Regions:
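GHKL-family ATPase ATP-binding module
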Residues: 1-247
């Protein structure tokens, strides 16, 4: 982790008792970290998103934001966040800032592209982060954490700094890499469709369960209208007649 989070640093560990030594040095910073994490995964696009920028939050304080992201064909999110090389397994304000900026930029990009013309899908942050591998590294003076274990960052100035850097860089990335942007957006749209299909399947199962518990006939078709004052019951003879009645 340290060799990835501190680009250019070479770490040499030697055990003189056993004559063993290990050298850790990786190029690319957190971008190389993402590539290392995805080494056994199927990456759906070639160009890894990467940005490294320092933001001035007040005359005496600078925050360095380094982010790398790449989507795979998986269904789970792999998100690693660090502040001054300390990992935050519970996230914090820096993670909230990144997710907020990423969701806003990608949703706007899809709405303004040809995807929105084909179909209208309400995207969520979970849809956008499906299959995502992301490493966020923050360098800032005097960070504040929720506890002594430092598992969650609570410094309020971290969120706007990360949002600013990620929003600008991600907008440029999508415009400059249209092929990768299309692949990423198609992956996100597929995730949204799957979520919506699962929701409808759950609703159908619950409705059927309610009908079954009421002792109604198994061939009774569900109502397409939710307002019961507008619903009617049609009694027809035979399955073929039932199909015609539904139409």
């Amino acid at each position: 982790e340290l060799s990835f989070l501190n680009n250019g640093v070479k770490i040499h560990l030697a055990d003189l008792r056993k004559g063993k030594d290990e050298v850790f040095q990786f190029a690319g910073g957190v971008s190389g970290f993402v590539d290392f994490i995805n080494r056994d995964k199927t990456k759906i696009h070639d160009n890894c998103f990467y940005t490294n920028k320092t933001v001035t939050v007040n005359p005496e304080e600078n925050i360095n934001v380094e982010v790398a992201m790449q989507w795979t064909d998986g269904y789970t999110e792999n998100f690693l966040a660090y502040t001054n090389n300390i990992p935050q397994k519970d996230g914090g304000t820096h993670v909230n800032g990144l997710r907020s900026a990423m969701t806003a930029v990608i949703k706007r990009y899809i709405e303004e592209s040809e995807f929105a013309k084909k179909e209208k899908i309400d995207l969520t942050g979970e849809d956008i982060r499906e299959g995502l591998t992301c490493v966020l590294s923050l360098k800032m003076p005097e960070p504040k954490f929720s506890s002594q274990t430092k598992d969650k960052l609570v410094s309020s100035e971290a969120r706007p700094a990360v949002e600013q850097v990620v929003r600008t860089a991600l907008e440029s990335y999508l415009q400059e890499n249209p092929k990768d942007a299309r692949i990423i957006c198609e992956k996100i749209m597929d995730a949204a469709r799957a979520r919506e299909a699962a929701r409808k399947a759950r609703e159908t199962t619950r409705r059927k369960g309610l009908l079954g518990s009421a002792g109604l006939p198994g061939k009774l078709a569900d109502c397409s209208e939710r307002d019961r004052s507008l619903c009617e019951v049609f009694l027809v003879e035979g399955d073929s007649a039932g199909g015609s009645a539904k139409q």
